[in-house]
Amino acid sequence: MYKRQELTKDQVRKIALEQDFVVAKKKDSTGICFIGERHFKEFMSNYIPKNPGQIIDMESKKVLGNHLGVMFYTLGQRKGLNIGGDRGPWFVVWKHLKSNKLIVAQDHHPLLKPTSATIDRINILKDDLMFPLDCHAKFRYRQADQSVTLDFKDGKLVAYFPQGIKAVTPGQEAVFYLNDLCIAGGQVEEIYFESKPLREWVEREVKDEI
């Protein structure tokens, strides 16, 4: 079920209820569109061969288990790691493609919350923007509005969020708003923690393991 031009999705759903459409009460999906009721890994494994590797705890440097292939996981992911324990949940901090290792940490680890990102493939939708400016951003579907400071440098947007935001991932789309007006968007190119690329922090922490 989709929003339509001037109608919000809630308004469309209300109309569907009034018309007794069968999809009126169908819950929203956050998965891949049009593949039906299939699990993400199951669907992707039809097109990407599995490539098992180790799951590494960034703090202890211990091997916690094995993954099916780093391409089946996303930064910030919690479910589906199959490495549960008494200490609490684990989250994906980084996917090291060269060594085929999945780097994880628990919720308290600061690197789970990057503090800035560069955005390329940009579209600026408002001509009179004065940078830097404070606005709101969304980095994934149905995410609550995130407060950011947006700047423009070397042909790219740079979003600063010193409070840290979980699960900002290279390749994701980023959309920026002033009040209810969409002012810009683009694709996350690189994520940073305290002005250094996150990948450099991770590679320094686990250099002997990768």
What is the meaning of each model-derived region?
Residues K3-W201:
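Nucleotide-activated chemistry modules centered on ATP-dependent adenylation/adenylyltransferase
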Residues V188, V206-E209:
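Long C-terminal interaction/binding lobes of large macromolecular proteins
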